Amino acid sequence: MAGGAVIENLSNRKLFVIFAGLLVIQIMFFLIGAWYAPSPSSYMEFEMITCRDETKGLSGEWIHRDNCQQISELSEYTPSSFDLREIVFIAKMPHTRDGIELEYSPWFQFLLGVLHVDVEYSEHFKYVAHAPLELEVRMGYRDKESKKNEWKELVTSNVTRILECTIAEDEKKAGGTYDCDMLDLFELGSSSYPFYLINIRIPINQQACQFDNKSANCQIGKLTGLRLIEIHQNGGFTLVWLWTKTFMTPVVAICLWWYYNRINQLARNPLLLERAILLLGLSLVILDFPIEWISLTYRIPFLLLISDLRQGLFYTVLFSFWLIFAGEHLIDDNTRNNLKSYRFNLSFIITASLGLLIYDLIERGIQLYDPFYSVWSSPTGSQIAYFAIFISAISTVAYFIFLFFKIARVWSTIKSKRSAQIYQTSENRRLKVEGVIYRFKFLMLFTLLCSAFTIAAYFMKQYGEAQLHGDEARDGFLTGSTSAFFTGAFGMCNIYVLLLLAMYAPSHKHYRGASQLIDENDDDEIMEDPSNQHTESNAMTTFLKPSTD
């Protein structure tokens, strides 16, 4: 049996069967998302009811539809004092439809709320660009066993958002309206309760505004109403997603254990490339593990944070592996199989990962106890977020420049050595080396395809989440029919890692304890080891290493 990895010793027929089977599985992942999974997210829109509270919130009483002294037209309402805290905007989530009280389900996984502010043009109450909007927000919840209006407090918070509005020239008249951007309001990392109630007060002291127009909410213009758009993950998508992860987790775990046993039974220490593949498989098992099943029974408010951390770990390991995968076929024997040789390139990945980790820990971490917090709501928080994202973006761009440079060098090295050496050898050896090169090229092309699809899926997910927080929340990428894209990307990542585990496992079926494997049926080795150090290595790596002649 020949030495090296499995990919170098399988027959073309077996490889074709394996690749054809993987292609069928990949198509199945796409079809599962296209046929069985609904769109990833859905939304509900609430026209917040305007109520009058004479106590101005001092009583601690929840204001809901049944005890609401409704204000029919806010623009015509005359308050009883200068303090406008007596005006309360309420929304009970979810809707009551056709007399049936709808419920939120743990299958929804998360709840996200964005706020739309209706501002009317007025010569007396003028809107000032970039006006800070201060809100006193109170969120309550109710269980199925509780009485209809028995609300328990979830969180109370004072939040500040920047109100960005524009108006056309022909709208600058009585009754004209501003076009205002959506505002982030809250984000819950789990859908733990079936019913929620929101009370919002906008603290405005009209007397203070007369003396200082920079007082709280004195520059927001003539506010006529609030609309709340709530977004959640579809339960049907969650079901398909969880069963897909549940099916793939043991498959990847078994393959990872098989791969570990293969490299552990060798008489040498694992190569750097083998250790990188092992770590990549482990990170995929962590990513695939369907911890979301637990959230269906128990309240896990930190589920979004865990999801982000798992995804960040996988992408960090995956990007590091791509560098090592390309680099191990280029560097010379003095530095090959040494992680220190990649410390410069890996520093870009570490920097980008740390930047995004800091941003995520601040945003998601604080939201664990204050879902109304947004890192973008304060100048200091915005600066930290922008700095972290900027450093991460620069590092990511630099990383991909190095990666594509290394891949280009690999292809160039293959071409030059192929023309210089292969055809000077025997026909049998030439055919073997041609097979090794062909299979390596295929895997490299599949790596490029997987990297492109993985990066596209990552950025499309980030773009979709940004849309959920902005003006395109109702028509965003994640609220469209994109389930096939995400299940397809998930399938490709798993297939790619499984292919690496299977194809790059040491091929030593009959020579488990040997330090060097030799083909008994061929005296002419595919790649001779001139140093005669008796270290089983990848044949492609041996072929591409610099000549010592």
Curated annotation (Swiss-Prot):
Per the UniProt topology annotation, the Cytoplasmic ranges are 258-275, 332-345, 405-439, 505-549
According to the record, what happens upon gene knockout?
Embryonic lethal with severely defective embryonic morphogenesis with no endoderm and excess mesoderm. In addition, embryos have defective mitotic spindle orientation in the 8-cell stage ABar blastomere.
Where found? Cell membrane; Early endosome membrane; Golgi apparatus membrane; Basal cell membrane
Tree of life domain? Eukaryota
- Looking at the UniProt entry, the stretches that span the membrane are 237-257, 276-296, 311-331, 346-366, 384-404, 440-460, 484-504
Q: Where is the composition biased (Polar residues)?
A: 530-549
Cell membrane found in the keyword field: yes
InterPro entries found in the cross-reference section: WLS-like_TM (IPR047843), WLS_GOLD (IPR053936), Wntless (IPR009551)
Q: Which UniProt keywords apply?
A: Cell membrane, Developmental protein, Endosome, Golgi apparatus, Membrane, Signal, Transmembrane, Transmembrane helix, Wnt signaling pathway
Q: In which tissues is it expressed?
A: Expressed in the tail hypodermis, stomatointestinal muscle, the mesoblast cell M and its descendants, CAN neurons, the developing vulva, the pharynx and the pharyngeal intestinal valve.
Topology versus the membrane, per the UniProt entry? Multi-pass membrane protein
Q: Which residues lie on this side of the membrane: Lumenal?
A: 36-236, 297-310, 367-383, 461-483
- A molecular function (GO) term: Wnt-protein binding
Family matches, as Pfam families: WLS-like_TM (PF06664), WLS_GOLD (PF21883)
Q: Where is the signal peptide?
A: 1-34
- Any single Gene Ontology cellular-component annotation: Golgi membrane
Q: Region entry Disordered: which residue ranges?
A: 524-549
GO biological process terms on file: canonical Wnt signaling pathway; embryonic digestive tract morphogenesis; endodermal cell fate specification; establishment of mitotic spindle orientation; intracellular protein transport; left/right axis specification; mitochondrial unfolded protein response; positive regulation of Wnt protein secretion
Tell me, in a sentence or two, what this protein's role is: Probable sorting receptor which regulates endocytosis and secretion of the wnt ligand egl-20. Recycling of mig-14 from the plasma membrane to the Golgi apparatus by the retromer complex is essential for its function. Its endosomal trafficking is regulated by its association with sorting nexin snx-3 on early endosomes and the mtm-6/mtm-9 myotubularin complex. Required in embryonic development for endoderm specification and the correct positioning and orientation of the mitotic spindles and division planes in blastomere cells.
Q: Which family does it belong to?
A: Belongs to the wntless family.
Report what the protein is called: Protein wntless homolog
Biological source species: Caenorhabditis elegans
